[in-house]
Amino acid sequence: MKAIAVLKGXSEVTGVVRFEQQED
């Protein structure tokens, strides 16, 4: 769920967010 929060924070972290989301 943290990934979602990061995504809203910024879109430059979208790459990292997607990777984290898959793991979660």
UniProtKB/Swiss-Prot annotation:
Q: Which cofactor does it need?
A: Cu cation; Zn(2+)
Domain of life where this protein originates: Eukaryota
Write down the top EC class of this protein.
Answer: oxidoreductase
Keyword Cytoplasm found: yes
Q: Which family does it belong to?
A: Belongs to the Cu-Zn superoxide dismutase family.
Q: This protein is called what? A: Superoxide dismutase [Cu-Zn]
Name the keywords, alphabetized: Antioxidant, Copper, Cytoplasm, Metal-binding, Oxidoreductase, Zinc
- The EC number(s) attached to this protein equal 1.15.1.1
Swiss-Prot/TrEMBL catalytic activity: 2 superoxide + 2 H(+) = H2O2 + O2
The UniProt subunit note reads as follows: Homodimer.
Q: Name one GO molecular function term.
A: metal ion binding
User: Its GO CC terms?
Assistant: cytoplasm
Q: How is the cofactor bound?
A: Binds 1 copper ion per subunit.
Q: What does this protein do?
A: Destroys radicals which are normally produced within the cells and which are toxic to biological systems.
Q: Where in the cell is it found?
A: Cytoplasm
